[in-house]
UniProtKB/Swiss-Prot annotation:
Top-level lineage group: Eukaryota
Cross-referenced InterPro entries: SPATA45
Organism of this sequence: Mus musculus
Family: Belongs to the SPATA45 family.
Name of the coding gene: Spata45
Stated name of the protein: Spermatogenesis-associated protein 45
C-alpha cells in the first residue's frame, strides 16, 4: 500500500512540476520572434536578408556618430571654386553689337 501511495505522490509531484514549468515559460518574456508569432514563412525572408532581425532591443548598442575623417574633411567646400563651365559664349542680343 505504501509503495502505491509513493508512486501516486511522485506522479502528482511530476505533474505539478510540469504545470509549474509551463506557467513559468508562459510568463517569461521571449525575445524570439518565432516564439511570438506563427508567421515563420515571413520571418525567414527577413532573417535571410537582414542579419540582425532577431536581435533584441535590450542587446542593441547605439553607436555615436563619428566625425568625418576622410582626406578632404578639413577642407571647406566653397561653391564658387568649381563654377560651371560654359561651352558657348553668352548670347549677344544687341542688333549691332
Amino acid at each position: 500500500m505504501t509503495s502505491m501511495n509513493k508512486g501516486n505522490e511522485e506522479k502528482t509531484q511530476g505533474a505539478n512540476r510540469k504545470q509549474l514549468l509551463e506557467e513559468l515559460n508562459e510568463k517569461r518574456e521571449s525575445y524570439c520572434l518565432v516564439e511570438r508569432s506563427n508567421e515563420v514563412n515571413l520571418l525567414r525572408v527577413q532573417k535571410r536578408h537582414f542579419s540582425k532581425a532577431y536581435q533584441t532591443l535590450a542587446c542593441m548598442h547605439i553607436k555615436e556618430s563619428v566625425p568625418e575623417s576622410t582626406r578632404t574633411s578639413w577642407v571647406k567646400h566653397d561653391l564658387s571654386v568649381h563654377k560651371e563651365k560654359r561651352h558657348f559664349l553668352p548670347k549677344n542680343n544687341a542688333i549691332f553689337g
